[in-house]
Design a protein with these regions (language model features):
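Glycine/proline-enriched, intrinsically flexible loops and inter-domain linkers
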Residues: 1-229
Length: 229
C-alpha cells in the first residue's frame, strides 16, 4: 500500500519468514496461517511473488517474523507524497475503499502479541477481514487517477496515504501534521458497514482496503466521481 500511495504501479513482491522449531506443533499452526494468508490475499491481486526465504529456529517459537518487500515503478517527477501540499489550509480529506466495521481495531498492538490458538476468538477483532478483489479494483482505479493527475499537473496539489495501523486517526494526522496543519474529521461522514459501534472504532480501525487523499476543494468531486464510477 505504501508503494502504491507514492503513485507507483506495484509490479512484484517478495517475502522473508522466520518461524520457530519446525517440529513444534505451534510453529506448524503459525506457519500454515501465515502462508495461507499471504497466498490468499496476494494471488487475487495478480502481483507476482518473485522470491523469498524461510528459516526455522527455536528463538522464534513465541513470535515469528514476517517481512514483506513490495516493488513498484514510478517516475521521480510523478511521486505522490504522503503529506498535505503547501498552502493546504482548507483542503479536503477523502476516504476511499471499504466501509468501516469493527475489524482491524487494535491491529498494531496485536501484531506484537504472542499468538495463542485458544485466544484467537478474543483477538478476532484486531484481525482485518480481507477483501483482495476490492483491493485489486482500488489499485486499478488509483492507477487511472494517477494518470489523470499527471496529465493535468496536479500531482503536487495532492497527498495520498493508506490508513496505517491507526485507521482514520493515523492517516488524517500524518497527512496534516507533517506539513504543519491540523485536521477536522467528521466521523458521521465515514461510510460504515456496521452501525452503533464506539466512535473510537470508526476512528482507529484499520483495513487493507482503505486509503485517504488530501486535495484542494476544486478537485474533490472529481476524485469522488472517479472512484464511485
Amino acid at each position: 500500500r505504501d508503494v502504491m500511495c507514492m503513485g507507483a504501479e506495484v509490479i512484484a513482491c517478495t517475502d522473508s519468514f522466520r518461524f520457530g522449531d519446525i517440529k513444534n506443533q505451534k510453529t506448524k499452526w503459525i506457519h500454515h496461517g501465515v502462508v495461507s494468508g499471504v497466498a490468499g490475499y496476494g494471488n487475487p491481486l495478480g502481483i507476482p511473488n518473485i522470491g523469498g526465504d524461510v528459516y526455522y529456529n527455536e528463538r522464534y517459537n513465541d513470535n515469528c517474523l514476517v517481512t514483506l518487500v513490495t516493488l513498484g515503478i514510478v517516475r521521480e517527477d510523478n511521486i505522490i507524497h504522503s503529506y498535505a501540499p503547501e498552502n493546504a489550509d482548507g483542503h479536503d480529506l477523502i476516504l476511499i475503499g471499504k466501509p468501516t466495521d469493527n475489524s482491524g481495531f487494535g491491529g498494531a498492538s496485536f501484531a506484537s502479541l504472542e499468538l495463542v490458538e485458544d485466544e484467537k476468538e478474543k483477538n478476532k477483532g484486531a484481525v482485518q477481514e480481507p477483501n483482495a478483489f476490492l483491493e485489486r479494483h482500488l489499485l486499478k482505479s488509483s492507477y487511472d487517477l494517477f494518470k489523470i493527475l499527471q496529465k493535468e499537473n496536479l500531482i503536487d496539489k495532492v497527498g495520498f496515504k493508506d490508513l496505517g495501523a491507526g485507521g482514520v486517526a493515523c492517516a488524517s494526522v500524518e497527512l496534516a501534521e507533517t506539513s504543519g496543519y491540523g485536521a477536522k474529521v467528521d466521523l458521521d461522514k465515514v461510510h460504515k458497514s456496521m452501525k452503533d459501534l464506539h466512535s473510537s472504532v470508526y476512528l482507529c480501525s484499520e483495513t487493507q482496503e482503505r486509503f485517504m487523499w488530501v486535495c484542494p476543494p476544486d478537485i474533490t468531486q472529481r476524485i469522488l466521481d472517479h472512484y464511485n464510477k
